[in-house]
Structure formats: C-alpha cells, structure tokens
Amino acid sequence: MIFASRAFVCLAWIFWIMIIDNFAIGKDNASMSVIEKPEYNPTFGSTYQRVKARGKVICGTNPDFLGFSVLRGEAAGFDVDICRTVAAAVFGDSKAIEFIATNGKTRFEFLRDGTIDILSAATTYTFTRNVIKKLEFLPTTYYDGQGFIVRKTLGVSSAKQLEGAKICFSSTGTGAKNIADFFTKHEINYIPIPVPPDKNAKNIYLAGDCDMYGTDRSGLASNRLSFADPERHMILPEIISKEPLGPVVKYGDQKWSDVVRWTIYVLFIAEEMGINSHHLNLMPTFVK
C-alpha cells in the first residue's frame, strides 16, 4: 500500500503543478496575442468525464500476480496501488476504485471498449503495441526482463543446458519471440508450447506438460511463491530480454492520459524527496 499512502501526500504536489502550469499557460497566451497562434488541436477523449460522473476509477489487473495485484485473496500490491493513487488524485479517495481481472486476450480489448479506464497489469511497452495497435503507454514503473523457472530435479543451473526441452509461455505476450531469439542465438533446440490466455502457462508447467516456464522474472518470482512446494523450483540466472512495464490507457485520450501520467510523475518526485507515509505527520500542513 506504499503507493496508495503516498498518493494523499502527493495530492498537494499535483495541485501546485497545476497552478504552475496554468500560470505558464497564461503567460504563453499573453505572448501569443501579438503573433499568430499555431494550429494545435489535441484529441480530448471522454474517459475523464466518464470517470468523474461514475465516481470511481475502473482498473484492469492481473488477478494472479502476488506482490503486484493480489495478497491473500485481496487486491493489493505494486500495480493496484498505482490505480489507487490515480483514484486519490481524481477524487481525493484511494478507495474510489474498482478492479477487473484481465488476461493476455482481454486486457487491450477492455481498454478499447471502455470496460476499464486504466490497465495496470505488468504490461510491456513495445513499439507494436504503441504505434501499430494504438495503445497509450505511460511512464515505466518497473523494469524487468524475461527469465525461466525449472524444477530442481531437472539438475540444471542454466537455460543453456536445456537442449530439447519443452518450454511453456503465454501465446499473447512478448515471450515467444524472446525465447526463439535466445535459443536460436545459442543454437539450442527446444520444443515451444504456446499457452492461450484462458489457460495459465503456470498451470501447464505445474501439470508437468513442459520442462520449463518462461515469463518476466517478477512474474516467475510471484508464481513461485504461489506454488505448493516453491523450494522445489528455481529461477535460472539468464535474463533474455528487457521488459519495461507500466500502466496503459486508451490511445488519443489526451486529458485522461495527462492525469495518469502526471500522477505517476508526482510519485517519482515524492520518492526522490523521501516523502512517504512513515513521516506524514511531520510534514508541513500545506503538504498534507
């Protein structure tokens, strides 16, 4: 709940940023009155108005991601706290939030059709998703990389020792290409087992249908904690990709993307300044 706690502390910073921005805009407008204004027609969507009218933010999350979206069956962790922070920025109440479970198939569909307002589910920022699929990625909040998990009984200490292994991975993420590139580079044969989003790759691995499971290392660590016998599994040392993870909103919805983007930036500023819930009562009144 670190992010959610910081949200209330940071609302003052959002307020002052808006004042400074408005002051700057006023100065710009005054100077522009003597020259021709340039063409500038940003597309403003309706998400912000819809959220305000509804009275809550709807956030899409990964329901199985311990430490990021769930703890003891409750919505808790890094990703969901980002959504709570946005709710605090918009309504002054981090509880003005609803969480909807998404997977690799539904997450972008829900964003486009308005089922969710923001996707915060360990989603990798890629060129294709941003430019081709038209999704608005916000500041990266977690830098990750893809790795592998195996059973210790396999007797290996490196992915390079897995000649001919069966490897499970999600069919909808960035994993397939990362795995293909890695094993091609090292001239290792393997048997790919792509798993559709409605069948969790973790479960296929636990059922014994593959020797190794590949995904982001944060996901591997989270999944391992959920295993009945986590000590029998190990995450291999290889990091085979760069995975910048962060929230996503609908493309072209300028006002809403600005709200979410600058809420995240304010969290970064608070982190740098050492502002957190532990010394909130010691902060000056205007910051509270």
Task: Give short role names for the model-derived ranges.
Residues 49, 80-88, 109, 113, ...:
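Solvent-exposed, polar/charged alpha-helical surfaces in well-ordered, non-transmembrane soluble domains
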Residues 52-53, 87-95, 112-116, 153, ...:
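Sec-exported extracytoplasmic/periplasmic mature domains
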